[in-house]
From Swiss-Prot:
Species the sequence originates in: Homo sapiens
Start-end of each LRR repeat: 172-193, 196-216, 221-241, 253-266, 281-302
Lineage, opening ranks: Eukaryota, Metazoa, Chordata, Craniata, Vertebrata
Record InterPro entries: Leu-rich_rpt, LRR-containing_protein_71, LRR_dom_sf
Family annotation (SMART domains): LRR_RI (SM00368)
Secretion signal span: none
Protein name: Leucine-rich repeat-containing protein 71
Amino acid sequence: MSSEQSAPGASPRAPRPGTQKSSGAVTKKGERAAKEKPATVLPPVGEEEPKSPEEYQCSGVLETDFAELCTRWGYTDFPKVVNRPRPHPPFVPSASLSEKATLDDPRLSGSCSLNSLESKYVFFRPTIQVELEQEDSKSVKEIYIRGWKVEERILGVFSKCLPPLTQLQAINLWKVGLTDKTLTTFIELLPLCSSTLRKVSLEGNPLPEQSYHKLMALDSTIAHLSLRNNNIDDRGAQLLGQALSTLHSCNRTLVSLNLGFNHIGDEGAGYIADGLRLNRSLLWLSLAHNRIQDKGALKLAEVLRAFELTHTEVVERRRLLLEKGTQERSRSPSSSRHGDSKTDREKSQMVGISNSALVDKTDKTQTMKTPKGLGKKKEKSWELAKKEEKLGSGQSPTQGTPKKEDATKAGKGKVTIPEQKPSRAKGIKIGSREKRSILLESELVVEATEVVNPLLEPVEHRDGKVFMPGNKVLLHLNLIRNRITEVGLEGFLATVQYQMQFSKAKSASKGPVGLLWLSLAKNCFAPQCPAYAIIQELMLPRDPIKAKLREDEAMAFFP
């Protein structure tokens, strides 16, 4: 027992607590040292610090620039830039080929591999599809983004990589989840792009505030705008109509506007018609698949024929006429000075020619006459020259008078392009430097007066009211699948008949002739409706596409 009791005391395991204390002290010192001296982690060899996207200089290759900028923005997974697939021509295999494929192709009987499944689902991955002008990666012509959300940061990437694309013509965004904020950012991006960008398509992007009219601002360069399937209602149509034209402003760049597959009703159609009253740039308008009934159809038809000006429009017309008169009166002294300078130069040339002719005549008659007669001839020639010089400071009987008449006519009458063409042709024939400079000045005046306010167009006064000829610039109007009945058809029939008479009267002179294509099919009337049949008959010879087809058929039958 004593040995058993003394054993624990003599056991070598007794000093363990001491050793534990010493080891604990060591560990605490190590932890303290680790806290005091943090370990320095060296970056791997070849890895650089992340670069900011502002420092990157774009190369003009969209695929490279977009990938690099997305990486610098912190994107790990981003859409790829691919060529837009083109539809292949339909291929109909023969019976022998189809039998051989069923016998020889093992893929038809076996299960699909993992690679084939991945290749199938690659189609649904977000991509940026591009069309190239040539087989050059720098010649991107159109951009298509379809079915994935475009965020604010992606638009920031586009603001860097799209401006270097010098041949970009169109941007198409289909169901990309735009908001009013991202639309504003997108609109701010457009002026940075190339001047060749004229077409924008925003389809399937409904916005709560319906701020699509911002794309049609006065400083916008968009010529073709498509806003299909955006749930645009009458409130959005009001904003679009005001963007087309108001009493004091007008969009002069938009050529085509597609508002199909929206929720525009009679009230919205009336707002669009109000925008067409003073707009003289829109050639193509589609309101297909909307909710327009007879009231809205009649408003659209009314603006395309002679319509009555409102009181505010009449007042604005008078103000514009007064301004035009004061401008012409202020221009008339400068134009007369130009005319006088022209006649002075021409008369000085005529004086030189007459003097040389007189000298030649005196040389010829020197041997025929006595010195006294020669002296008399010389005196007479100098008197004639002095008289012509005096006339040169005033008016020339041959050239000065018609020039002054032209100047007074130009000051009194309306300045138009056809009236300026003869003067330009005369200036080109003369060919002197001074006349070329005057010609350039006249061209600048013509360009400034090219865009005439529609309120200054010729009007007709009837029963104390002022009537404008109507919008003859719109060539294409699509109203398929609305809710128009025979009542609305009568309004369009009157419009077509009026435009036919107007075009016959204007056949000799060039200018807008009115609608060339009008589509009213699949509305709330029978196809055999008499008014619809008459409209179709009247519009058939005006349709340029069908007229071209008839010409081709005639050439085929009678080569």
